[in-house]
């Protein structure tokens, strides 16, 4: 995973311009941290290639010290076992005085916090 000093649109344009899907693997915008900060995730050769592209253009990058490409296609391998492990859990009652904003949708969320939501959070952009 790679933290960048690029916003979402600039990061998406860079991924498209890199044209890495065919040779080096896939890269996605995993996290939109702010209007000027994203985290990329995916296949390491492609992520490293894009990192060099960005550095050459003077854009901040930092490789994250993680062993897994979270919020990418890599998480699809564990999604079903994650779903099964969450099946028996129940959530506590939702408090109306506390607002929850979904990192998946970016909007306020008031219901449907079941296992499927947390799997979506695992495999999707946040």
Predicted segments, located by residue:
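Helix N-cap motif at beta-to-alpha junctions
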Residues: 8, 42-47
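Short amphipathic alpha-helices in soluble, non-transmembrane regions
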Residues: 15-18, 47-57
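Generic recognition of flexible, low-complexity loop/linker segments
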Residues: 25-28, 88
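A generic structural motif
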Residues: 36-41
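Short amphipathic alpha-helix segments
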Residues: 3-23
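Short beta-strand
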Residues: 27-33, 63, 93
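Acyltransferase
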Residues: 2-3, 12, 55-126
